[in-house]
């Protein structure tokens, strides 16, 4: 029933008749022979070896496939990396080397790719495990199948298929191992099958039932085995994990042990070196200490002697200073008294001469009228006088010709002189002098005309009256008796005498008339000459204005270029422009080297040292006896720490150790590279100890000439000296940025720093400059300048008592200020100093036009002191505002001013000096006290020439004294001014409202005593006033002994509207009648002492008819009481006399954006918003924005802009703006009834193609301000979100001063507004 069980039974040769039965015959002989041969060859090899070979081939095939797949994955990754890098490189080249794309992390992408690879591998492993499980199940099923003698059961019906016993029956026998000798043996008799068929079927059915039961039991066993296999697998995995963890722990422990050993070795080397150095230093220090002790003893003795000598010298110095001060005061008072004495003496001499002339004329008139006895003598004298008159007439004619020639010469000389000296100013002076002479001549002509109207009768009556008065005085009564007795006798004779005297007087009057006619002609000639000079002056003025416009345009172009070049220089010197490069990929580098881009700042470089390998000589092997020594190397480069290579075993250790150093390419580094070498030491390690066995010197000077990697070798020298040729070291080094490019960048940076810090002067140079500057300023008044240009020199000497925001650190201060329309100027940074000495000197060339004049009179120069070490941006440690009004009057500003921080607390002092190089000449549209002083200068030229030049403003810092105010507590200033001219014609009080507003950061201002020179004003002389009134007013100008003190609003305090109204009442009480004659000054922060007309031409045209007002030159110092909120009134000033005039304040709206703060909102959490600036818009006017954008503040913090803008709304030039204010007061429906402040997000520098975005909006209603009757002074207004539903996002601190302008508009349109 069952076949043989031998495994090799199928391999025995049998007769195969099955193939021939099917008719294949010879067609299958070749294949069968081949199979037979292969089976015979396989039968010679054992089954176990065949299985072993098969399994090996199968495993090798699987490994090769896995390796091929890994290589394909690597190739794909490298291809994607290469494509990505090529695309990035092309994009960077198109953009121009811009910064790399944000949000891209190469390491993250690499990690993601590795994780994806692991996922793929795990999925493959999972599939293989599933296949194995399926195959295992199939094997279990096949093993449980029981073999039967029947391959199959024949079908009981005819299915049309060939029966299996025809072809398969004979083929099964060889497979089962049954041998047949003949084909007939295989046929079974049919009767036997039918006989046993039923019994076999029943047995088969029983066996099938048994087998089904066995199958069920086997399935249960299989499930149990599978469950057991899973349990074993989990246990196996757990054990594998435990083994791996133990292996990892052992490896980590081994690595930590090795690292600790290396660290210990390195520390031992360092400690050994430090010990040697410390011992040497200690011995040297001991010797120095002994020497210093001896020197200290001698220094103490000399110090005590010097201190005693210094105390004596200090006492002497104090005494000498006191004496000097007293002598200076006496000299000052003596100078003034001498001037007054000289002036009075000159006037006395003039009056005495006039008195003598009048006396002589009176005597002559008396003798000619009443001396009858000397008639004959008079006739002789008359003839002689006629002869003399004829001679004088001829002489007069010759003198007139000479005079005309002299005048012509004088005119030519004047023209030449005008070309050399300041032509415009000299022409003005000549015009004023000629004008004054013409006025005097007109007055004399009037007097002579009045004398010509006298009749002969009136003359005789006047002579008789004079004679009678004289006789009464003399008491000669006998003459009257004689006249009474002889009156009848000599009546005819007296009549004849009277007729003769009348004829003589008529002749004299005729001569006088002729002389007056001649003088009138001369005056006409003078008047024509004056008109010609005036036309010439106007032409010159037009030419000058055209030149000034051209110069201003050229200066604007030059300023723009300078600003651009300064920005480029600052970018080169301080910019953060980064140098990008890719590391070189050498042929011997591995393919998987991580590709990165290193970013270097300007001036930085990356120096690399690579220690490749060390080759020991055979002598080392013989001497040491160790075939595989354990070695490592150490070296130290420049000022960096010691570097250690890995520990390697062998005679030819390959360390492959690279160290990178971030260096600054400067003179020290270049000198170090060129001249110095570094020492590389080779150490041999013995477990936890080591020994230095060899050393060598590494040189790097070739890097200055070559670029890229420079490969070198160095010979090792044994430390013991017994082995001279110890071995060689192979190393290479390189600079990432090539040396030529690094040196070029360093030179550019050094050159830019030199340009930027070129204004930094040493203290000795500044001292010599300060000594020479006053001479230059004095000479500049007569020297000519290039057109209308002038230079303002600003010097920042020092700061004192500065404090850092961190109390335990010293600040690194520097000062920043902005003058006029020039760029910001900053000083050098003084590191770690509370009292820095800057000595920073800067000059600004400016055209003397109306814009500059308005700026000087209405603005202050703000000095900000910043701390360079402060990490928080835009927070200054001190600020002060210096008024510039004194510069508009050609005066120097020099003093020590008190600084205040952003919290309005005192923060130290600063010493600044501002002065002109040449004399400041105000433009033609503005008149100053100096121009008016030129009017009087022609009357007394000699006195003016004897005066010393104007002294600069001297300052004296006093103790600060707090003063309560609306929102500030500044310290008062004590201000006094010394007169530049000998007279002062008028006095004024400070204008109550027309002043510049002080910046809110200024709280404490130092109390300064200023001696300032003031210029007299034009005396107002009425046409009806007599000569006596003029003399009387002139005498009044000399009577005062005290100077008037004038106050600058920018130096004292801010002014509220209440104080303005109070001072208006005071000034109206003092002098209400001259209010209409006053015109407002262009200054917003100073007092022009006296009435000033709007321009020079109007003042000169009105000069003959001006009235003369008196003034007293007073010298007094007055202070404002701390309890007042406004400048001192007339009752608080002790030295002021005369009239005080009231000027109308300038009509303007002042807007100041101070600071911005944000709260917790979406704006603070939005990372795309980085920098913010503020925009301000008033109705349809162009928007004004802060000049800089500041970083977004954190929640609750403030950023300070400190930006101010002024909108002028005066009647003359800004009527449209006043109409807008009128509409606001009428509360009409307007698109913007208020000031609109918009907080705007500025895109970052690397994304300039993006547009600005409105973040927040704030409003200030001007109509509400007018109803409340007050300005907004440092008020915090709410900022609402412009993008969302209008929720609050922060606060904006602003100052809006518009109440005065609104009140002015309301007064002008009161009827319309009330209607």
Swiss-Prot record:
Coiled coil: 64-144, 197-256, 326-555
Effect on the protein upon substituting residue 1264 to Y: In patients with Leber congenital amaurosis
GO MF, one example: thromboxane A2 receptor binding
Region listing for Disordered, in residue ranges: 1021-1083
The entry's keywords: Cell junction, Cell projection, Ciliopathy, Cilium, Coiled coil, Cytoplasm, Cytoskeleton, Disease variant, Joubert syndrome, Meckel syndrome, Repeat, Tight junction
Source organism of the structure: Homo sapiens (Human)
Protein name: Protein fantom
Main location: cytoplasm
Bias kind Acidic residues: ranges: 1060-1083
Domain C2: 577-713, 773-897
Record's compositionally biased regions (Basic and acidic residues): 1028-1044
Subunit structure: Interacts with NPHP4 and NPHP1; NPHP1, NPHP4 and RPGRIP1L are proposed to form a functional NPHP1-4-8 module localized to cell-cell contacts and the ciliary transition zone; NPHP4 mediates the interaction between NPHP1 and RPGRIP1L. Interacts with IQCB1; the interaction likely requires additional interactors. Interacts with TBXA2R (via C-terminus). Interacts with RPGR. Interacts with NEK4. Interacts with NPHP4, INVS and DVL2; the complex is proposed to be involved in DVL2 stabilization.
Distribution of this protein across tissues and organs: Ubiquitously expressed with relatively high level of expression in hypothalamus and islet. During early development, expressed in multiple organs including brain, eye, forelimb and kidney.
UniProt effect for mutating residue 615 to P: In JBTS7; affects interaction with NPHP4
Cellular component GO terms, alphabetical: axoneme; bicellular tight junction; cell-cell junction; centrosome; ciliary basal body; ciliary transition zone; cilium; cytoplasm
Listed InterPro entries: C2-C2_1, C2_dom, C2_domain_sf, RPGRIP1_C, RPGRIP1_fam
Known role: Negatively regulates signaling through the G-protein coupled thromboxane A2 receptor (TBXA2R). May be involved in mechanisms like programmed cell death, craniofacial development, patterning of the limbs, and formation of the left-right axis. Involved in the organization of apical junctions; the function is proposed to implicate a NPHP1-4-8 module. Does not seem to be strictly required for ciliogenesis. Involved in establishment of planar cell polarity such as in cochlear sensory epithelium and is proposed to implicate stabilization of disheveled proteins.
Compartments, record wording: Cytoplasm; Cytoplasm, Cytoskeleton, Cilium basal body; Cytoplasm, Cytoskeleton, Cilium axoneme; Cytoplasm, Cytoskeleton, Microtubule organizing center, Centrosome
Family that this chain belongs to: Belongs to the RPGRIP1 family.
CDD domains linked: C2
An annotated GO BP: lateral ventricle development
Pathological condition linked to this protein in its record: Ciliary dysfunction leads to a broad spectrum of disorders, collectively termed ciliopathies. Overlapping clinical features include retinal degeneration, renal cystic disease, skeletal abnormalities, fibrosis of various organ, and a complex range of anatomical and functional defects of the central and peripheral nervous system. The ciliopathy range of diseases includes Meckel-Gruber syndrome, Bardet-Biedl syndrome, Joubert syndrome, nephronophtisis, Senior-Loken syndrome, and Jeune asphyxiating thoracic dystrophy among others. Joubert syndrome 7: A disorder presenting with cerebellar ataxia, oculomotor apraxia, hypotonia, neonatal breathing abnormalities and psychomotor delay. Neuroradiologically, it is characterized by cerebellar vermian hypoplasia/aplasia, thickened and reoriented superior cerebellar peduncles, and an abnormally large interpeduncular fossa, giving the appearance of a molar tooth on transaxial slices (molar tooth sign). Additional variable features include retinal dystrophy and renal disease.
């Amino acid at each position: 029933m069952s076949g043989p069980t031998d495994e090799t039974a199928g391999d025995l040769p049998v007769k195969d008749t099955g193939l021939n039965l099917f008719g294949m015959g010879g067609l299958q002989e070749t294949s069968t022979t081949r199979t037979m041969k292969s089976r015979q060859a396989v039968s010679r090899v054992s089954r176990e070896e065949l299985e072993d070979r098969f399994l090996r081939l199968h495993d090798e095939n699987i490994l090769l496939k896995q390796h091929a797949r890994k290589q394909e994955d690597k190739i794909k990754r490298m291809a994607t990396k290469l494509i990505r890098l090529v695309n990035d490189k092309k994009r960077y080249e198109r953009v121009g080397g811009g910064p790399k794309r944000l949000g891209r992390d190469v390491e993250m992408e690499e990690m993601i790719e590795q994780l994806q690879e692991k996922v793929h591998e795990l999925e493959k492993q999972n599939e293989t495990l599933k296949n194995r499980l399926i195959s295992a199940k199939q094997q279990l099923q096949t093993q449980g199948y029981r073999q039967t003698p029947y391959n199959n059961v024949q079908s009981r019906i005819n299915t049309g298929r060939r029966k299996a016993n025809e072809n398969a029956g004979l083929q099964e026998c060889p497979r089962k191992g049954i041998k047949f000798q003949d084909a007939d043996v295989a046929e079974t008799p049919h009767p036997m099958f039918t006989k046993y068929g039923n019994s076999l079927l029943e047995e088969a059915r029983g066996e099938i039932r048994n087998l089904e039961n066995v199958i069920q039991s086997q399935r249960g066993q299989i499930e149990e085995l599978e469950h057991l296999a899973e349990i074993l697998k989990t246990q196996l995995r757990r054990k594998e994990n435990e083994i791996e963890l133990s292996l990892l722990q052992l490896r980590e422990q081994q690595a930590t042990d090795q690292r600790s050993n290396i660290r210990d070795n390195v520390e031992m080397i360092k400690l050994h070196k430090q010990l040697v150095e410390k011992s040497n230093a200690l011995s040297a220090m001991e010797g120095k200490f002994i020497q210093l002790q001896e020197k200290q003893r001698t220094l103490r003795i000399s110090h005590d002697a010097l201190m005693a000598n210094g105390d004596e010298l200090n006492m002497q110095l104090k005494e000498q200073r006191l004496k000097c001060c007293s002598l200076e005061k006496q000299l000052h008072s003596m100078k003034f008294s001498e001037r007054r004495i000289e002036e009075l003496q000159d006037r006395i001499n003039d009056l005495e001469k006039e008195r003598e002339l009048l006396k002589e004329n009176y005597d002559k008139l008396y003798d000619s009228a009443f001396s009858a006895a000397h008639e004959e003598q008079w006739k002789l004298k008359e003839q002689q006088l006629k002869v003399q008159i004829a001679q004088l007439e001829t002489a007069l004619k010759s003198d007139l010709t000479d005079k005309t020639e002299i005048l012509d010469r004088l005119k030519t000389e004047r023209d030449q002189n005008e070309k050399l000296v300041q032509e415009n100013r000299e022409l003005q002076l000549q015009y004023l002098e000629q004008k004054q002479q013409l006025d005097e001549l007109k007055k004399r002509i009037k007097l002579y005309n009045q004398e010509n109207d006298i009749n002969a009768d009136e003359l005789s009556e006047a002579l008789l009256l004079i004679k009678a008065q004289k006789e009464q005085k003399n008491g000669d009564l006998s003459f009257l008796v004689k006249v009474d007795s002889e009156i009848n006798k000599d009546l005819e004779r007296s009549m004849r005498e009277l007729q003769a005297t009348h004829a003589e007087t008529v002749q004299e009057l005729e001569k006088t008339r002729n002389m007056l006619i001649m003088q009138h002609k001369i005056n006409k000639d003078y008047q024509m000459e004056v008109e010609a000079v005036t036309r010439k002056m106007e032409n010159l003025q037009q030419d000058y204005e055209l030149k000034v416009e051209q110069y201003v345009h050229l200066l604007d172009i030059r300023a723009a270029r300078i600003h651009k070049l300064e920005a480029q220089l600052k970018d080169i010197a301080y910019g953060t422009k980064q140098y990008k490069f890719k590391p070189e990929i050498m042929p011997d580098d591995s393919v998987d080297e991580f590709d990165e881009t290193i970013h270097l700042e300007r001036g930085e470089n990356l120096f690399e040292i690579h220690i490749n390998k060390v080759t020991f000589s055979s002598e080392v092997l013989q001497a040491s006896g160790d075939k595989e020594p354990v070695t490592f190397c150490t070296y130290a480069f420049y000022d960096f720490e010691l570097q250690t290579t890995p520990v390697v075993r062998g005679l030819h250790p390959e360390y492959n150790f690279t160290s990178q150093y971030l260096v600054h390419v400067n003179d020290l580094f270049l000198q170090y590279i060129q001249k110095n070498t570094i020492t590389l030491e080779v150490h041999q390690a013995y477990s936890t100890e080591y020994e230095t066995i060899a050393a060598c010197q590494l040189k790097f000077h070739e890097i200055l000439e070559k670029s890229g990697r420079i490969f070198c070798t160095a010979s090792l020298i044994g430390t013991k000296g017994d082995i001279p040729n110890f071995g060689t070291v192979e190393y290479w080094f390189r600079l990432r940025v090539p040396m030529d490019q690094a040196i070029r960048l360093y030179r550019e940076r050094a050159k830019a720093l030199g340009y930027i810090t070129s204004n930094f002067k040493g203290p000795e140079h500044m001292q010599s400059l300060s000594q020479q500057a006053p001479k230059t300023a004095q000479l500049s008044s007569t020297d000519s300048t290039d057109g209308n240009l002038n230079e303002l020199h600003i010097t920042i000497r020092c700061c004192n008592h500065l404090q850092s925001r961190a109390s335990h650190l010293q600040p690194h201060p520097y000062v920043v200020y902005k003058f006029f329309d020039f760029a910001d100027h900053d000083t050098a940074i003084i590191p770690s100093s509370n009292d820095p000495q800057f000595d920073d000197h800067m000059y600004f060339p400016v055209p003397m036009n109306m814009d500059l004049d308005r700026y000087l009179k209405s603005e202050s120069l703000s000095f900000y002191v910043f701390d360079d070490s402060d990490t928080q941006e835009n927070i200054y440690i001190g600020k002060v505002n210096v008024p510039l009004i004194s510069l508009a009057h050609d005066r120097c500003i020099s003093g020590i001013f008190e600084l205040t921080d952003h919290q309005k607390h005192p923060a130290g002092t600063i010493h600044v000096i501002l002065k002109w190089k040449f004399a400041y000449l105000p433009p033609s549209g503005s008149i100053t006290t100096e121009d008016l002083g030129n009017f009087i200068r022609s009357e007394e030229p000699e006195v003016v020439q004897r005066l010393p030049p104007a002294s600069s403003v001297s300052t004296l810092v006093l103790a600060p004294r707090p003063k309560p105010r609306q929102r500030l507590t500044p310290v008062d200033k004590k201000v006094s001014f010394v007169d530049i001219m000998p007279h002062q014609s008028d006095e004024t009080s400070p204008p109550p409202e027309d002043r510049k507003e002080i910046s809110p950061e200024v709280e404490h201002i130092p109390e300064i005593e200023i001696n300032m020179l003031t210029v007299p004003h034009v005396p107002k002389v009425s046409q009806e006033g007599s000569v006596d009134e003029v003399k009387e007013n002139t005498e009044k100008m000399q009577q005062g002994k005290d100077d008037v003190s004038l106050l600058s609003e920018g130096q004292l305090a801010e002014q509220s509207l209440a104080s303005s109204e109070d001072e208006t009442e005071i000034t109206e009480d003092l002098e209400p009648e001259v209010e209409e004659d006053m015109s407002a000054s262009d200054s917003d922060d100073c007092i022009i002492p006296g009435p000033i007309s709007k321009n020079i031409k109007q003042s000169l045209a009105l000069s003959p008819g001006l009235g003369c007002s008196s003034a007293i030159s007073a010298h007094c110092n007055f202070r404002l009481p701390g309890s007042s909120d406004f400048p001192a009134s007339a009752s608080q000033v002790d030295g002021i006399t005369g009239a005080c005039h009231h000027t109308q304040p300038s009509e303007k709206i002042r807007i100041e954006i101070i600071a911005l703060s944000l709260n917790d909102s979406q704006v603070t959490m939005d990372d795309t918003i980085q920098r913010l600036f503020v925009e301000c818009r008033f109705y349809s006017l162009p928007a004004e924005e802060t000049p800089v954008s500041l970083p977004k503040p954190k929640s609750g913090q403030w950023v300070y802009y400190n930006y101010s803008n002024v909108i002028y709304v005066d009647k003359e030039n800004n009527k449209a703006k006043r109409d807008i204010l009128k509409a606001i007061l009428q509360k009409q429906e307007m698109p913007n009834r208020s000031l609109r402040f918009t907080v705007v997000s500025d895109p970052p520098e690397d994304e300039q193609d993006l547009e600005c975005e409105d973040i927040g909006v704030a409003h200030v209603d001007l109509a509400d301000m007018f109803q409340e009757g007050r300005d907004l002074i440092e008020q915090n207004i709410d900022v609402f979100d412009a993008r969302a539903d209008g929720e609050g996002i922060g606060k904006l601190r602003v100052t809006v001063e518009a109440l005065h302008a609104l009140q002015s508009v309301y007064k002008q349109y009161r009827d319309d507004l009330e209607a």
